[in-house]
Design a protein with these regions (language model features):
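Alpha-helical transmembrane segments of multi-pass membrane proteins
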Residues: 19-22, 156-159, 201-212
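Transmembrane-helix signature of polytopic, membrane-embedded enzymes
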Residues: 144-148, 163-186
Length: 221
């Protein structure tokens, strides 16, 4: 078992991983650009995605060099521990995917216990804490546990959910598309606190998908 304790939010590998990640994010954003090109709301896609990416980078700098410690550090260390668990034993991935919480008797738990931190081995037993790095793990595996790249991917996930919410309001009030864009897509606080390795990011994304799904079933039909 490899010990990897680090709260360095920026690593040398980000020099080549971050541009690659940004390329993939904008490639995915092209789907929205093409789909809504001939609508009044199509022009908001690229700015909404870009501002979230800027917010993710800014958050990484602030949490890494100003605060120096916070919830994101614990989530990130949890992701690193899961990364090494899967690296050591591929079957761990199935265990992480299928289980919504970790117990002290699980083979996975030793990675949190011996990672060099003091508190994480206790925090990670709380499902709400455990599930943040769990849901972010696919991006961590894809980009070699880069915090910045994980943040970029999660910022796009948040955009997807927020866009669904904006689309619902646009369908209800098409004449207010500009004001709705400012209120839903460009709210400053969400561009900082809802674009990285945080519970808020997943909550925003899930809320957008859930609300639009409920609207589609109960109202739009």
């Amino acid at each position: 078992m490899e010990q990897d304790f680090s709260w360095d939010m920026l690593r040398w590998q980000d020099l080549y991983l971050a541009p690659l990640c940004l390329l993939l994010v904008y490639f995915a954003a092209r789907f929205y650009v093409k789909k809504y090109r001939n609508t009044p709301i199509g022009k908001y896609v690229v700015p909404a995605v870009t501002l979230r990416l800027v917010g993710a980078f800014t958050y990484t700098l602030v949490i890494g060099f100003y605060y120096g410690f916070g919830d994101s550090h614990n989530y990130y260390q949890g992701l690193i521990d899961m990364f090494h668990a899967v690296k050591d034993d591929g079957s761990m991935l199935g265990n992480i995917v299928m289980k919504g919480k970790v117990e002290e008797t699980d083979p996975l738990y030793r990675y949190f216990y011996y990672d060099g931190t003091y508190a994480l081995k206790y925090y990670i037993l709380e499902p709400r804490t455990y599930n943040v790095p769990r849901f972010a793990l696919p991006f961590g595996l894809l980009f070699n546990r880069s915090f910045l790249c994980v943040s970029f991917c999660l910022s796009f996930l948040a955009f997807m959910g927020t866009w669904r919410l904006y689309k619902m309001f646009y369908e209800l009030y098409p004449h207010l598309h500009k004001k709705l864009a400012y209120a839903v897509l460009f709210m400053p606080s969400t561009l900082f606190w809802g674009v990285s390795l945080l519970k808020d990011t997943f909550c925003m994304a899930a809320m957008g998908f859930f609300v639009y799904a409920a609207y589609s079933v109960l109202i739009k039909k």
